[in-house]
Swiss-Prot record:
Source species of the chain: Chlamydia trachomatis serovar D (strain ATCC VR-885 / DSM 19411 / UW-3/Cx)
Name this protein carries in UniProt: Inorganic pyrophosphatase
Compartment(s) of residence: Cytoplasm
Annotated positions binding Mg(2+) 2: 97
Superkingdom of source: Bacteria
Lineage: Bacteria, Pseudomonadati, Chlamydiota, Chlamydiia, Chlamydiales
Keyword hit for Plastid: no
Keyword field contains Glycoprotein: no
Subunit organization: Homohexamer.
Length: 209
């Protein structure tokens, strides 16, 4: 009997993103609030790698990762530019990022979970679209009933926005008030989040299929 080599599906290319028109999403988690190291999926191998230690006091306040079979390319960049009233905005060339809210103490990354999108944060990083979709863990006892970002506690959204505004900043740049490369254009709700996801999924299909 011949032996079949064992293989593991690539977290970016293997899982099915959605089976119900973006109401529920498969999410790959890279970072948890317990991590003092920034982990990142290696796009070539599909292995979770150390990107860099967290240099300063910033810790991601939520589960953070990516959406399988998404890519921030031309369609994503064009839409971000339209909504931001900016020209020449491009996609950042990465899978679409996702932040997952849960009251559970999940301390391990490199996992898949199901979450429902409730909105997103429109971010420009060096004039590239770098949106963060906000979602809630399915059946979560605290966040599970939230349907739209407008129902999310403001303090939670403030913490997430503060993290992404400052996690790349140095104390020197903050003290000297140097212009930030990262800009939060605004928040948007569930319906627009689903459109952002759909465009990123189309970008992925255009690139890989």
């Amino acid at each position: 009997m011949s032996k079949t080599p064992l293989s593991i599906a690539h977290p970016w290319h293997g899982p099915v993103l959605t089976r119900d028109d973006y109401e529920s999403l498969c999410c790959y988690i890279e970072i948890t609030p317990a991590d003092s190291v920034k982990f990142e999926l290696d796009k070539e191998t599909g292995i979770l790698k150390v990107d860099r230690p967290q240099k300063f006091s910033n810790f991601c306040p939520c589960l953070y990762g990516l959406l399988p079979k998404t890519y921030c390319g031309d369609l994503s960049g064009e839409y971000s530019g339209q909504q931001s009233n900016r020209e020449n905005i491009k996609g950042d060339g990465d899978p679409l990022d996702i932040c997952v809210l849960t009251e559970k103490n999940i301390t391990q990354g490199n996992i898949l979970l199901q979450a429902r999108p409730i909105g997103g944060i429109r971010i420009l990083d060096s004039e590239e679209a770098d949106d963060k979709i906000i979602a809630v863990l399915e059946d979560d006892l605290v966040y599970g009933n939230i349907e739209d970002i407008s129902e999310c506690p403001g303090t939670v959204l403030d913490m997430i926005q503060h993290y992404f505004l400052t996690y790349k900043a140095t104390p020197e740049s903050l003290i000297q008030a140097k212009p930030a490369k990262i800009e939060i254009v605004g928040l948007y709700g569930k319906k627009e989040a689903q459109k952002v996801i759909r465009l990123a999924h189309e970008d992925y299909c255009n690139l890989f299929m």
